[in-house]
Amino acid sequence: MTILSNDILTVEVSGHGAELQSIRKGDVEYLWQGDPSFWGRRSPVLFPIVGSVWESRYRVGGKEYQMGQHGFARDMEFTLVSCSQTEVRYRLESSDETLARYPYPFLLEIAYRLHGNSLDVVWDVMNPSDCDIYFQIGAHPAFFYPDYDPEKSGRGFFTFDRNEDLECIRIKEKGCVDAETKWSLDMPGGRLKLEKDTFDSIDTIMLQDSQIRRVNMFREDGSLWLSLSFDAPVTGIWSPPGKVAPFICIEPWYGRCDRVGYEGDYRDKDWVNRLAPGKKFESVYTIEIA
């Protein structure tokens, strides 16, 4: 476990999955702590897929592979590359084990960088091969509801950098989406009200096409709790349906689950990223604690 700290925040990161474990301001914990009765993870990195592939199978060049939801990086041990008081970097490289499940060579580095009341999460994906590679990558951080009470309905609310005319798509079958049906996101007064049953019928709120770039999470009294900012083209918002869970996930994605029934090549799936030989994909998202 690596601990980063400054005068405001203390952050913990594990080498297993290069997964964020804790964000504390004083004695207050902001990151969900992984109670398995609700959801046993905290902030997994999703790679080389985001979400599910149809029937847990996908095809590359006519060959079929098996892949579980959200890929394998979250369950692998990363190598520590560098560490200071405010920054740590981990690395995962392709191996015989990964190539048996995902036929593209890769080098994935994940860094956490603390500054003031903010934490940058940095992703670098490199292509060491002489052919194009295709991948998806995403975040899945879970944050405590600050005013959680299982007996009460209200959980606070979200605002976005854009609060009008937002459209979302929904999970339909076997973890895959109906990509053609768009639903208007109801935001009276520019607020997405969070209730204990918000996700019981929809599973995930999924916004595509870079509709939003910032999510602000507010307490019931209207005070700001935290914010996420990002450049990812797809955003997922999720809490376990039917569990009255004490947390919510805000998920920037460079990717998305398959359409229902998709059986094409992996390189042609929705929201896949192509990386040329010797090139590097770079991205960062920022968690800002109020």
Predicted regions and their residues:
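Acidic/His-leaning functional-site neighborhoods
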Residues: 9, 25, 70-82, 189-270
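Beta-strand-rich interaction surfaces with strong enrichment in secreted/lumenal proteins
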Residues: 109-111, 270-275
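Acidic, contiguous internal or C-terminal segments within carbohydrate-active enzymes
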Residues: 4, 94-148
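Extended, loop-rich substrate-binding clefts of extracytoplasmic carbohydrate-active enzymes
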Residues: 64-116
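Active-site/ligand-binding surface loops and adjacent short beta/alpha elements
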Residues: 132-134, 142-145, 149-230
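Beta-strand-rich N-terminal accessory domains
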Residues: 1-57, 64-67, 210-232, 279-289
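A short, structured loop/turn motif at beta-sheet edges
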Residues: 81-88, 113-118, 147, 151, ...
